[in-house]
Amino acid sequence: MELVDTPSLEVFEDVVVDRQVAGFDPSFWGDYFITNQKSQSEAWMNERAEELKNEVRSMFQNVTGILQTMNLIDTIQLLGLDYHFMEEIAKALDHLKDVDMSKYGLYEVALHFRLLRQKGFNISSDVFKKYKDKEGKFMEELKDDAKGLLSLYNAAYFGTKEETILDEAISFTKDNLTSLLKDLNPPFAKLVSLTLKTPIQRSMKRIFTRSYISIYQDEPTLNETILELAKLDFNMLQCLHQKELKKICAWWNNLNLDIMHLNFIRDRVVECYCWSMVIRHEPSCSRARLISTKLLMLITVLDDTYDSYSTLEESRLLTDAIQRWNPNEVDQLPEYLRDFFLKMLNIFQEFENELAPEEKFRILYLKEEWKIQSQSYFKECQWRDDNYVPKLEEHMRLSIISVGFVLFYCGFLSGMEEAVATKDAFEWFASFPKIIEACATIIRITNDITSMEREQKRAHVASTVDCYMKEYGTSKDVACEKLLGFVEDAWKTINEELLTETGLSREVIELSFHSAQTTEFVYKHVDAFTEPNTTMKENIFSLLVHPIPI
C-alpha cells in the first residue's frame, strides 16, 4: 500500500532553521534496570512450580460438574496461568460447547458464554433472551444478583454489531453494579470495581493478573495450590522480563544515537519494553518482545523527528532515503540524521541475523512496512505545514497507518515461533484484514483524544478530533463522544473476526487483539507513553520492579 510518492530530491544544504521542539519529559528510569537487578532464587521457584502444575493437571482430571469445570478454567485464566494448561483447557471447552445451559442461572450461563467466546466458539447470544420480560427489558429480579450481573457484564463485551441484546446487557449491568457496589463485601467489591473500570475482554492480561492475585488471595473459596502457582509464575516471569529489559537498556545505551542529544526524542525504552511485554508475556515470545521493543523505540525516534523537529524538506530527504534503503543515501541527509539512518539500517540487519534462514523472509515485510510508515509521517508533515484539515475518512486512511500499529504488529510477528509466523500469516496481515484495520482505528482515536490538549500547544497535524469538529461543526466534547462510538464499533468488529476461521494459528489473530487492548494500558485517560510519570510508571513498578510476596 503506497501512501505518497516522494519526488526527486536535492542535496541538503545547512541553513539556520527556527524549529518548534516539543518538550518531552526525560526518562524516569535511567539505568535502573541495568544496575538494580534483584536476585530471586529461580531454581527453587521452578522446581516448586513444576510440582504445583502437576497438581493442577490432576484437578482437570478429577473435576466433576459443569460449574466446577468452568470455575477452574476461569480462575486459571484470570490468574494468567492458562498458557501452562492449553491442552487441558481446550479439551474441557470442547466438551462444554455442547452442554445445554437452559437449566442454569445467569452467572453460569454468562460464564459459559464468555469462556467459549474467548476461544473463538460462536455460541449464540440468544441464551440471554430468557432473562428478559414481556416488554423486552432485563428482568427486575436480576438487579440484586451481583454475581450474575458481573458475569453478564463481562460476557456482553464479547458482542458483535448485530447483537443488540448484549449492548442492552452492558447498560443494564453497569448501572446496577454501580448502584450495588457500596454494599458489596470485599474481595468481590474489588473485583467489581476493577472490571467496571476495564472489562475482562479489554484488559491487558498481565496487568489484570497482578490485580486479580491480590483479590483472589482473599476469596473464601480460594484454592491454595492455584494461588501459590500464580504467585510463583508471576515472579518467575518477572525475573525473565527483568533480564530482557536489562539487555534492552544496555542495547539502547550502546546504540548512543547522536539524535538523542538534541533532546526532541521521547526516551522511552523501558516503556517500549513494557508495551511489548504486556501484549505477550510468555517465555516463548522472548525474541518477539526484544525485536518489537527495539522496533518501537526506532518508531518513536522516527515519529518525533518528523513530528517535532525536521523541516518539510528534511522530512522529504529522510523519506526518500528510507525508500531507497541504501547506506549511500546518507550523504543526502542533514548531519543530525546521518547517524540514525545508518544505525537504522544496521538494526534491521540485526533483526534478520536473529532469524533462522527459513524465517528471514519476514524482514522483507518489515522493511516494506517501515517504508510505508515513513511515507505516512511525511504526508502528515505536508498536511501540517499546509494547515490542511481533511475530512475524517481521508484522515483515517492515512492515520491508521501513521499511528504505527501495523508496523509494530509486523515487528512482533517477525519474532514469533515458526509455527505461528508463517508466510501465510504475513500475507494475511499484509492484506490489511478487518481486524487489523479495527485495531489500528482503536489505537488511532484513543491516541488522538488523550494527546489532544498537549498537541494544541504547538503546530501539529490535524487529529481525528479536529477533522470531526470541522466536518460536522461540533464541539470538542461531541466530537470525542462520536469518535468513541467508532471505537466501540471497532471492538465489535474485532469480536466478529475472532469468531471467523482464517486457517491461521489463533495466536496470529489474537496478537492483533492483544495489541488493541494496550489502549487501556497506554491511552486510558492520558497519553501515558508521552507522559510516563502517570499510570505507566505505576504499571512498570508493579509488573517489572516489585515481586509478589509469597
Swiss-Prot record:
Keyword Transcription regulation part of the UniProt annotation? no
Q: Which Pfam families match?
A: Terpene_synth, Terpene_synth_C
Q: What cofactor is needed?
A: Mg(2+); Mn(2+)
This enzyme's EC code(s): 4.2.3.55
Which molecular function terms from Gene Ontology are attached?
Answer: magnesium ion binding; terpene synthase activity
For the biological process aspect of GO, one term held by this record is:
diterpenoid biosynthetic process
Q: Any keyword Cell cycle? A: no
Q: Which positions does UniProt annotate for Mg(2+) 2 binding?
A: D303, D307
| Positions contributing to Mg(2+) 3 binding | S451, E455
> Its catalytic activity?
(2E,6E)-farnesyl diphosphate = (S)-beta-bisabolene + diphosphate
Tissue specificity statement from the Swiss-Prot or TrEMBL entry: Expressed only in young rhizomes. Not detected in leaves, roots and mature rhizomes.
Motif mapping: DDXXD motif: 303-307
Binding positions for Mg(2+) 1 per the UniProt entry: D303, D307
Q: InterPro entries under this entry? A: Isoprenoid_synthase_dom_sf (IPR008949), Terpene_cyclase-like_1_C (IPR034741), Terpene_cyclase_plant_C1 (IPR044814), Terpene_synth_N (IPR001906), Terpene_synth_N_sf (IPR036965), Terpene_synthase-like (IPR050148), Terpene_synthase_metal-bd (IPR005630), Terpenoid_cyclase/PrenylTrfase (IPR008930)
UniProt cofactor note: Binds 3 Mg(2+) or Mn(2+) ions per subunit.
Superkingdom, natural source? Eukaryota
Going by the UniProt record, its keywords in alphabetical order are: Lyase, Magnesium, Manganese, Metal-binding
Which family is it part of? Belongs to the terpene synthase family. Tpsa subfamily.
Please name the PANTHER family in this protein's record.
Answer: ALPHA-HUMULENE_(-)-(E)-BETA-CARYOPHYLLENE SYNTHASE, OS04G0344100 PROTEIN-RELATED
Q: What is known of its domains?
A: The Asp-Asp-Xaa-Xaa-Asp/Glu (DDXXD/E) motif is important for the catalytic activity, presumably through binding to Mg(2+).
Q: What does this protein do?
A: Sesquiterpene synthase involved in the biosynthesis of bisabolene.
Q: What is this protein called?
A: (S)-beta-bisabolene synthase
Question: What is the species listed in this Swiss-Prot or TrEMBL entry?
Answer: Zingiber officinale
Q: What phylogenetic lineage does the species belong to?
A: Eukaryota, Viridiplantae, Streptophyta, Embryophyta, Tracheophyta
